[in-house]
Regions:
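Transmembrane alpha-helix termini and helix-breaking/packing motifs in multi-pass membrane transporters
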Residues: 1-7, 59-64, 121-141, 214-215, ...
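C-terminal transmembrane bundle of multi-pass solute transporters/carriers
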Residues: 16, 26-30, 37, 43, ...
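Paired intracellular helix-loop junctions of major facilitator superfamily
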Residues: 96-104, 301-308
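Extracellular/periplasmic helix-loop-helix junction of adjacent transmembrane segments
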Residues: 1-22
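Hydrophobic alpha-helical transmembrane segments
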Residues: 69-80, 106-164, 204, 221-222, ...
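Pair of pore-lining "gating" transmembrane helices in MFS-fold secondary transporters
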Residues: 1, 77, 183-202, 282
Length: 373
C-alpha cells in the first residue's frame, strides 16, 4: 500500500515485491549449505533479531517523513536477504521440532495454520491501522512483535545437531544437492511444480492494491479485506490438511491446489464484484496452500537428513520466484490491464495442474525413494 501511495504505479508495487523476494531466490541455496552445517535454531534466532531491526528502520523513516520509493526498495531488499537465511533454517527447525516422520505432515500443516491465521487477521488489522494512523504504526508494531518471537525461541531446548564428518566447498555441496534432487523422482517432480506456482500463482496478492483502489474504489481497508480473504483460504486449507492425509495422496492434493488456485484467478478476472473477488481471493489462497504445504511435507518426508537444509533451500528458491512473477505481472498489468494479467496467470496454473495430474498418482508410489513412472 505504501509503495502504491508513493508512486501510483502498479509496476512499482511489483518492484517492491521483487526487491523483498529476489534475495531469497539468489541467496537461499547458499544459506541452505550453511543450514546443513550449523544449528538451525541459532540461525532462526539471529534472523528474528535482524528482521526486528529492519521493521524498526521502516517505522523510523515513515514516521519522519523521509520515506521514498528507492529507500523502500532498499529496505525491502534487506528484508529479502533476512528471509533467505530464515526460511531454509526454519524448515530444518520444523523437522527437528517434530522429531518423528510419522507426525511430520501434521506438524507442517499446523505450522501453516499458525502462519495463515496471522495472514488472516494481520492484513485486516493492518488495513484499519493504516487508514486510521498510517503505515508507520504498522511497521512499529511489527518490530515490537518480534520480542515475543524471540522470547519463544529462547525457551526452545533441542539437542545439538549431529555434525557432518565431511564438509566440501559450498559450491560443491550445492551441486551435489541439485544432483540428488534431480535423481530422486518424487523430489524432482515437486521441485518442478513449485516454481511455476511461485511465479504466477500469487498474482492476486501482487495486484491487490490495484484492485482495491482502482477496480473497487476502496482504500487500505479494502486491501486488508482482500488479503485477509487470501489468508482465510490458506487457513482453511491448512486445517483440512492437519486432519490427516496419507503420503500417497499428497501429490494429488498438489494438483488439486493448482487447479483451485488457477480457477479462482480466472473467475476473478471475469467479474468486477467485490464480494465475488473476496471468494476468488480465498480460493486462490486455498489453492496456493494446497500446493505449497503438501509439497513441503513430501520433500521433508523424502529427503535425507544430511541434505535437508540444501533441498529445502531449493524449495524456498522455487517459492521465491514470486518476485520475478511480481515484476512480470506488474509490467503485464500496465500493458494489458490487471484483469487480463490475472487471467493469464490463472490459465498457467490450470495448465500446470493438468500436467502434474498425470504423474501425481505415481509420485509417492515408490516410498521414500520412489521410482519414476
Amino acid at each position: 500500500w505504501l509503495a502504491y501511495h508513493l508512486s501510483g504505479s502498479p509496476f512499482t508495487v511489483g518492484m517492491v515485491a521483487f526487491a523483498s523476494q529476489i534475495p531469497v531466490l539468489v541467496c537461499a541455496p547458499f544459506f541452505g549449505v550453511w543450514v546443513d552445517r550449523v544449528d538451525s535454531l541459532q540461525l532462526v534466532r539471529w534472523a528474528q533479531v535482524l528482521a526486528m531491526a529492519q521493521s524498526a528502520a521502516l517505522a523510523v523513516f515513515t514516521f519522519s517523513g523521509h520515506m521514498t520509493v528507492p529507500l523502500l526498495l532498499g529496505l525491502c531488499f534487506v528484508q529479502g536477504f533476512i528471509n533467505a537465511l530464515d526460511w531454509p533454517a526454519r524448515q530444518a527447525l520444523v523437522f527437528r521440532l517434530a522429531g518423528d516422520r510419522a507426525v511430520l505432515d501434521n506438524v507442517i500443516a499446523l505450522n501453516s495454520i499458525t502462519f495463515n491465521l496471522c495472514r488472516l487477521v494481520g492484513p485486516a488489522i493492518g488495513g484499519l491501522l493504516i487508514a486510521a494512523w498510517g503505515p508507520g504504526v504498522v511497521f512499529a508494531l511489527d518490530a515490537v512483535s518480534y520480542l515475543a518471537v524471540l522470547a519463544a525461541l529462547a525457551a526452545v531446548r533441542l539437542a545439538p545437531p549431529v555434525k557432518r564428518l565431511r564438509v566440501a566447498h559450498p559450491l560443491v555441496e550445492l551441486r551435489d544437492a541439485v544432483r540428488y534432487a534431480w535423481a530422486h523422482p518424487t523430489i524432482r517432480r515437486v521441485l518442478s511444480v513449485v516454481p511455476i506456482i511461485g511465479l504466477v500463482g500469487f498474482a492476486h496478492t501482487v495486484l491487490a492494491p490495484v484492485f482495491a483502489r482502482d477496480l473497487f474504489g476502496g482504500d487500505a481497508r479494502t486491501l486488508g479485506f482482500l488479503l485477509s480473504a487470501t489468508g482465510a483460504g490458506s487457513l482453511a486449507a491448512g486445517i483440512w490438511l492437519s486432519l490427516g492425509r496419507s503420503a500417497e495422496g499428497m501429490a494429488r492434493v498438489v494438483a488439486w491446489g493448482a487447479l483451485i488456485g488457477g480457477t479462482g484467478l480466472a473467475v476473478m478476472a471475469a467479474h468486477s464484484s467485490l464480494a465475488l473477488a473476496l471468494v476468488c481471493y480465498g480460493a486462490a489462497g486455498c489453492g496456493a496452500a494446497l500446493v505449497m504445504v503438501p509439497s513441503n511435507t513430501i520433500l521433508q518426508s523424502n529427503v535425507d537428513d544430511d541434505k535437508r537444509g540444501r533441498v529445502m533451500a531449493l524449495f524456498t528458491m522455487g517459492q521465491s520466484l514470486y518476485p520475478v512473477g511480481s515484476l512480470l505481472i506488474g509490467a503485464l498489468a500496465e500493458g494489458v490491464g490487471p484483469k487480463v494479467a490475472v487471467a493469464i496467470c490463472g490459465g498457467v496454473c490450470i495448465a500446470t495442474a493438468a500436467t502434474f495430474w498425470r504423474a501425481s498418482g505415481l509420485a509417492m508410489a515408490g516410498g521414500r525413494h520412489g521410482s519414476p513412472p
